[in-house]
């Protein structure tokens, strides 16, 4: 259908370009017709008609009425004719626009196919030339390899001839030497024998003769041994020469085999290149045929365009095709939706399994850390704010200083860029939290940083007090938040005012816990139960140098109280030290054991000695990072001391 429309547009465009005056004249005619129709619709008539109707006298009034009626009939017919002419002109105009569009499509298809076929033909010819060049190069290489092969054969033959000649010459020389030695000995002993025969026999001489005979026998034996040794040496030398000759022959045969294999490979390459050149030639012939076929198709398209000028059904067929395409696309969309739902289900299943495995591995890691000791030390790292000489090994939990190569060990080193505060509590910290709740042991989380880190506290409150969590379902949760200081006034952070009395926050040390005389909030509906001043930005950070304590008590919902005995809660303490002065006091009073009996020091000693401890070092300041790193070393030394005491 597209080809017929293109042909239709091609012929119509030629017609329009050859007769541009017709278009302008038709436009002017249309304008004139529109004015005429408007005049007739307004009821206006030509001036000649008006004058003709006004001229007759009163006497001839009857014939004038009949004449006006006939004129009205003629005007209505003229109006109908003009309406028909307008419709015909509109249809002609639409047909011309369709012909122009078809002609444009034909031109685009024609030039596109011809350019594409020419480009493919040029491409195939360039490939053929390239392959022919490769064939010529390979034939030259093959001829050169044949020459090298012939030279090697000649060299091998000449080398074999020289070796055989050397072997024959050595044998001849050895035989001549042995023959000369034998002749000399024979002449010597014949002379001696003649001398002895000429000498008159004597007793001493006879003895000497007998002695000489013995020596002769010994010499014969030695001579026979020498002959045997010479023969053995000759055999060994010949066998060695044969081995050398065989090895030389095998080496040369291997080189010959390699050359023959290369020759065969080159012949195979020539055959493949010839077959590819034949294929390319066939493809070129096919392209030529396709070009001829495309020309025939173009001629057929032109003929179909002529037929399309008479028929007015392409729009219907096109609409049917569009509806079919729409149905096909809708079916594809449904299939894609089904596939997407299946993939989403598969992804959710795999994600759940991965989460289960990660939770299992975290629990296993937590149990291993629990076996090592009661204190944990994690590093929460912001690399962009730290000096460049620190090297971080996240897998092994190690931080190394580049210059001194001093190593600081942690249970975990967590990057802030990959793990946010919310993810830290849900992924890394939750296993420790759940373990302490299940074991019903009081525990703490001590956050140490040289700069304020209020977002960590906010994430902790969300983790503990958010609605519809597992902790809300299993426990009744109470929360207290106070600020303690040795130098300034202490404050109850849940109240909307600050007390002026330094001793306004009273502490009481109990067995394995600390009670706070401050406002207590029961969290049942999530964060809505917290005071407004706690959720707003009135106190984003701690007021001044000191320590912030959040005490959270978990009362089990399913525990049954006997008589007056209340259910025993599990206490959790969040300690926040976010300035250098407080950290130095913490280091002196806890690890270096200096005499510092301040309230903050007593609270920290009580919590570290009677509850499970979790140290979180927030490394986010390049100036005072060494102080926190030394605290990590001291935590590790305290852990080793506790292990020794236990053993």
UniProtKB/Swiss-Prot annotation:
Disruption phenotype: Short metaphase spindles with splayed microtubules increasing spindle width. Its main location: cytoplasm. The keyword Cytoplasm applies. GO terms for cellular component: cytoplasm; kinesin complex; nucleus; spindle pole body. Gene3D superfamilies: 3.40.850.20. Keywords: Coiled coil, Cytoplasm, Cytoskeleton, Nucleus. Transmembrane segments: none annotated. Pfam families: Microtub_bd. Residues 36-55 are annotated as: Disordered. One of its GO terms (biological process) is microtubule nucleation. Residues 36-51 have a biased composition (Polar residues). Residues 202-350 form a coiled coil. The keyword Thylakoid does not apply. It comes from the Eukaryota. It is found in: Cytoplasm, Cytoskeleton, Microtubule organizing center, Spindle pole body; Nucleus; Cytoplasm, Cytoskeleton. One of its GO terms (molecular function) is cytoskeletal anchor activity. Together with the minus end-directed microtubule motor KAR3, plays a role in microtubule organization. Recruits KAR3 to microtubules, and together they may stabilize the polymers. The KAR3-VIK1 heterodimer cross-links anti-parallel microtubules. Targets and/or maintains KAR3 at the spindle pole body during vegetative growth. Interacts with KAR3; the interaction is direct. This is Spindle pole body-associated protein VIK1. It comes from Saccharomyces cerevisiae (strain ATCC 204508 / S288c) (Baker's yeast).
């Amino acid at each position: 259908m597209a080809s017929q429309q293109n042909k239709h547009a091609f012929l119509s465009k030629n017609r329009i370009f050859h007769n541009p005056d017709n278009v302008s004249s038709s436009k002017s005619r249309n304008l004139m017709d529109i004015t005429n129709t408007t005049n007739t619709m307004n009821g206006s008539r030509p001036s000649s008609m008006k004058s003709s109707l006004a001229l007759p006298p009163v006497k001839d009034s009857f014939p004038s009425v009949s004449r006006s009626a006939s004129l009205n009939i003629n005007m209505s017919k003229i109006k109908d004719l003009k309406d028909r002419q307008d419709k015909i002109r509109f249809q002609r105009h639409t047909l011309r626009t369709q012909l122009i569009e078809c002609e444009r499509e034909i031109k685009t298809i024609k030039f596109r196919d011809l350019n594409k076929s020419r480009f493919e033909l040029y491409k195939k010819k360039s490939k053929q030339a390239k392959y022919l060049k490769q064939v010529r190069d390979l034939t030259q290489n093959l001829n050169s390899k044949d020459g090298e092969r012939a030279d090697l054969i000649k060299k091998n033959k000449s080398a074999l001839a020289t070796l055989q000649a050397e072997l024959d010459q050595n044998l001849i020389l050895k035989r001549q030497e042995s023959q000369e030695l034998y002749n000399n000995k024979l002449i010597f002993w014949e002379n001696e024998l003649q001398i002895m025969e000429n000498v008159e026999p004597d007793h001493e001489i006879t003895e000497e003769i007998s002695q000489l005979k013995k020596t002769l026998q010994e010499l014969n034996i030695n001579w026979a041994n020498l002959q045997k040794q010479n023969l053995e040496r000759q055999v060994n030398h010949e066998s060695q020469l044969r081995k050398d000759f065989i090895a030389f022959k095998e080496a040369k045969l291997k080189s010959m085999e390699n050359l023959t294999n290369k020759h065969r490979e080159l012949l195979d390459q020539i055959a493949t290149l010839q077959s590819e050149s034949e294929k390319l030639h066939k493809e070129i012939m096919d392209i030529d045929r396709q070009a001829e076929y495309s020309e025939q198709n173009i001629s057929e398209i032109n003929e179909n365009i002529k037929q399309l000028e008479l028929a007015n059904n392409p729009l219907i067929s096109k609409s049917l095709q569009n509806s079919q395409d729409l149905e096909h696309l809708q079916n594809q969309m449904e299939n894609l939706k089904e596939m997407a739902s299946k993939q989403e289900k598969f992804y959710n299943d795999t994600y759940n399994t991965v989460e289960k495995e990660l939770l299992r591995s975290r629990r296993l890691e937590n149990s291993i850390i629990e076996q090592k000791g009661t204190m944990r030390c994690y590093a929460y790292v912001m690399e962009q704010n730290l000096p460049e000489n620190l090297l971080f090994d996240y897998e092994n939990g190690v931080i190394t200083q580049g210059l001194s190569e001093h190593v600081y060990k942690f249970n975990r080193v967590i990057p802030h860029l990959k793990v946010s505060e919310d993810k830290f509590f849900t992924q890394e910290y939750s296993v420790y939290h759940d373990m302490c709740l299940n074991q019903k042991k009081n525990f703490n989380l001590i956050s140490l940083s040289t700069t304020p880190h209020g977002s960590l506290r906010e994430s902790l409150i969300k983790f503990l007090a958010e609605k519809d969590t597992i902790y809300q379902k299993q426990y009744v949760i109470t929360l207290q938040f106070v600020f303690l200081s040795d130098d300034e006034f202490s404050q109850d952070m849940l109240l909307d005012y600050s007390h002026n009395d330094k001793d306004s926050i009273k502490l009481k040390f109990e067995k394995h816990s600390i009670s706070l005389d401050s406002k207590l909030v029961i969290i049942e509906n999530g964060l809505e139960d917290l005071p407004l001043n706690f959720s707003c930005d009135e106190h984003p950070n701690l007021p001044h140098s000191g320590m912030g304590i959040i005490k959270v008590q978990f009362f089990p919902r399913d525990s049954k109280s006997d008589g007056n005995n209340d259910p025993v809660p599990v206490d959790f303490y969040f300690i926040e030290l976010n300035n250098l002065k407080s950290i130095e006091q913490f280091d002196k009073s806890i690890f270096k054991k200096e005499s510092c009996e301040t309230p903050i020091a007593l609270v920290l000693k009580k919590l570290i000695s009677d509850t499970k401890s979790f140290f979180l070092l927030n490394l986010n300041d390049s100036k005072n990072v060494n102080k926190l790193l030394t605290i990590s070393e001291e935590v590790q030394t305290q852990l080793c001391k506790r292990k020794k005491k236990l053993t």
